[in-house]
């Protein structure tokens, strides 16, 4: 009955797609439990590269059942685009299961997301503009539309009308936009529902039954710990819980069925969008890391902000997620550096802090306290045994492990699927 949770331990883009695909070939189900198509991950198989946004990474593994859980907000149009794109490349998507209780991103959610972000100006959050936040807001305000609502025309019309009543007032009076038509929106959603219906299931029941039968389920989180609405750098966060606890609420599986929690971290740190980032690099160093790591968002194409490894962030991620293992990715990107700084603590207004400040004013004022380690020049992409890594590279990994307080079980040494060093198995 292994239930394995896989989460990002930083601000996202850590390489969860590669880690999920590594584990996903050995599991029976891969379930997304939060977020929507604002999460981008790339899976590389041989010469093929698959950019996924809404679908679980396990869709690439033919013997795995991919599941979109109730905690995900689903944009049907994006889902179908992604399915069509994969099927045109020979990937079978008929195995996909979508929770009947998942909330829908309607066209008006995307409109509201974009006009609100523009209206905020310099106070913007840095959203992807894909309607994620407004859809989650409707969920909390109890005016959201769920997947099963798409199959009852009269019921759906009533729900759309209720949802648009206040939104149209805002669009017209606050944002000087035209109101959204209730009938047109209902008809559009009904058509999307017709195509979605074959994939819809009671996924909580499916996953619990699978675990009770001794099958292995991988719970895949979108975004990452530092973007969690409760535990991240609020307000510069996403609208859901990408931390390990979200795996339970986002799939309807109880915590006693979780046996492993795996955090994915880069050997350095990146962030997209607004918000504090203590180890952020500017100038030539930041440009070098961005170029070496090809650091551009899968979902947005935006250049990622880059910085040195932050052990305070990783310790915090280990704490709030209860990490049992770390997958360290993109270690190869650091090849060629003579010295590699890593952040071991913060200076906050003259005081050393080894823990994560929860006050965002303090976190914004945090200055990294660095220690420096010698780098390496050797190509490590073909190394498959930890002991065959350059000594200075081994020392760097061991120091990250020591500072994070959690064992590093897998190391990514390049972009390909087989560019890994597996120290410990991630499946019991």
From Swiss-Prot:
Assembly and binders: Homodimer.
Keywords: Cytoplasm, GTP-binding, Ligase, Magnesium, Metal-binding, Nucleotide-binding, Purine biosynthesis
EC number of this enzyme: 6.3.4.4
Keyword hit for Cell division: no
Catalytically driven reaction(s): IMP + L-aspartate + GTP = N(6)-(1,2-dicarboxyethyl)-AMP + GDP + phosphate + 2 H(+)
GO terms, molecular function: adenylosuccinate synthase activity; GTP binding; magnesium ion binding
Name listed for the protein in its UniProt record: Adenylosuccinate synthetase
Pathway membership, UniProt: Purine metabolism; AMP biosynthesis via de novo pathway; AMP from IMP: step 1/2
PROSITE patterns: ADENYLOSUCCIN_SYN_1, ADENYLOSUCCIN_SYN_2
Biological role stated in the UniProt entry: Plays an important role in the de novo pathway of purine nucleotide biosynthesis. Catalyzes the first committed step in the biosynthesis of AMP from IMP.
Species for this entry: Bifidobacterium adolescentis (strain ATCC 15703 / DSM 20083 / NCTC 11814 / E194a)
TM stretches of this protein: none
Lineage: Bacteria, Bacillati, Actinomycetota, Actinomycetes, Bifidobacteriales
């Amino acid at each position: 009955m292994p239930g394995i949770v896989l989460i990002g331990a930083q601000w996202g883009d850590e390489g969860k797609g590669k880690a999920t695909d590594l584990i996903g070939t050995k599991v029976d189900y891969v379930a997304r439990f939060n977020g929507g198509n604002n999460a981008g991950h790339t899976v590389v198989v041989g010469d093929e590269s698959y950019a996924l946004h809404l679908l679980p990474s396990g869709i690439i593994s033919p013997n795995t059942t991919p599941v979109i859980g109730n905690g995900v907000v689903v944009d049907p149009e994006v889902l179908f685009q992604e399915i069509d794109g994969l099927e045109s490349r020979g990937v079978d998507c008929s195995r996909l299961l979508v929770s009947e209780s998942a909330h829908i991103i309607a066209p008006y959610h995307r409109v509201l997301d974009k006009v609100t972000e523009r209206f905020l100006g310099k106070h913007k959050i840095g959203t992807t503009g894909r309607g994620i936040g407004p859809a989650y807001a409707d969920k909390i305000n109890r005016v959201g539309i769920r997947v099963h609502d798409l199959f009852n025309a009269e019921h759906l019309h009533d729900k759309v009308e209720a949802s648009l009543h206040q939104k149209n007032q805002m669009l017209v009076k606050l944002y000087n936009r035209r109101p959204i038509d209730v009938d047109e929106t209902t008809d559009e959603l009904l058509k999307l529902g017709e195509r979605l219906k074959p994939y819809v299931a009671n996924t909580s029941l499916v996953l619990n039954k699978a675990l009770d039968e001794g099958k292995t389920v991988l719970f895949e989180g979108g975004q990452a710990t530092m973007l969690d609405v409760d535990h991240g750098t609020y307000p510069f966060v996403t609208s859901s819980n990408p931390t390990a606890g979200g795996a339970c609420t986002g799939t309807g599986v109880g915590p006693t069925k979780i046996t492993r929690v795996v955090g994915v971290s880069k050997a350095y740190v990146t962030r997209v969008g607004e918000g504090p980032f203590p180890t952020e690099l500017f100038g030539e160093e930041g440009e070098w890391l961005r170029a070496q790591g090809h650091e551009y968002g899968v979902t947005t194409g935006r250049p990622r902000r880059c910085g040195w490894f932050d052990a305070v962030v990783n310790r915090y991620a280990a704490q709030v997620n209860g990490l049992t293992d770390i997958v360290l990715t993109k270690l190869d990107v650091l090849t060629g550096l003579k010295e590699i700084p890593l952040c071991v603590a913060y200076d906050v207004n003259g005081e050393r802090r080894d823990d994560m400040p929860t006050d965002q004013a303090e976190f914004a004022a945090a200055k990294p306290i660095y220690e420096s380690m010698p780098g390496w020049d050797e190509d490590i992409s073909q190394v498959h045994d930890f002991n065959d890594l350059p000594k200075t590279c081994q020392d760097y990994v061991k120091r990250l492990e020591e500072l994070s307080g959690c064992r590093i079980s897998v190391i990514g040494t390049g972009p390909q699927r087989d560019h890994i060093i597996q120290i410990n198995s991630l499946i019991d």
